[in-house]
């Protein structure tokens, strides 16, 4: 755990890092895999908390969050802070991690099927 002025932030452990590494090895961008892994464990977090816990830079977190938002994998909620200024955004996964893994699995199966179809076409042309 990392303790900040606001609260404590869970950091990724070895199992979490392995999980993110496997997602990355399957073709997911590293920073996206890390943010998904973190949110699956933390439930919800601000970009600042994600950065502290994952050691990703703020720009890396922003790009990963944008990519996940574009894929409809995360939601964002505005949370007003006690002081002045704009509200903070808190992110969470829209689906349980098992559903995200299933979606990723289906995508890989579809890609494999397309590759096998191309190979069969090649064989037919020989």
Residue ranges of predicted features:
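A short acidic, leucine-rich amphipathic alpha-helix
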Residues: 49-53, 68
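Pre-recognition alpha-helix immediately N-terminal to the DNA-recognition helix
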Residues: 33-37
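Key DNA-contact positions within bacterial/archaeal DNA-binding proteins
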Residues: 59-60
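N-terminal leader segment of winged-helix/HTH proteins
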Residues: 1-26, 82
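Glycine-centered, phosphate/nucleic-acid-interacting loop/turn motifs that mediate DNA/RNA or nucleotide
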Residues: 72-73
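Short, cationic-aromatic polyanion-contact patches
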Residues: 21-31, 46, 79-101
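Amphipathic alpha-helical dimerization/coiled-coil segments
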Residues: 95-126
């Amino acid at each position: 755990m990392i303790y900040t002025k606001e609260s404590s932030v869970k950091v990724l452990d070895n199992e979490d890092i392995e999980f993110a590494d496997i997602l990355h090895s399957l073709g997911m961008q590293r920073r996206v895999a890390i943010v998904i892994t973190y949110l699956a464990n933390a439930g919800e977090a601000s970009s600042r908390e994600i950065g502290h816990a994952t050691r990703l830079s703020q720009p890396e977190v922003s790009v990963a969050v944008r990519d996940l938002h574009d894929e409809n994998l995360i939601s964002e909620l505005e949370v007003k802070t006690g002081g002045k200024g704009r509200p903070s955004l808190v992110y969470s996964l829209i689906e349980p991690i098992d559903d995200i893994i299933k979606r990723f699995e289906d995508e890989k199966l579809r890609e494999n099927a397309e590759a096998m179809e191309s190979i069969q076409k090649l064989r037919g042309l020989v």
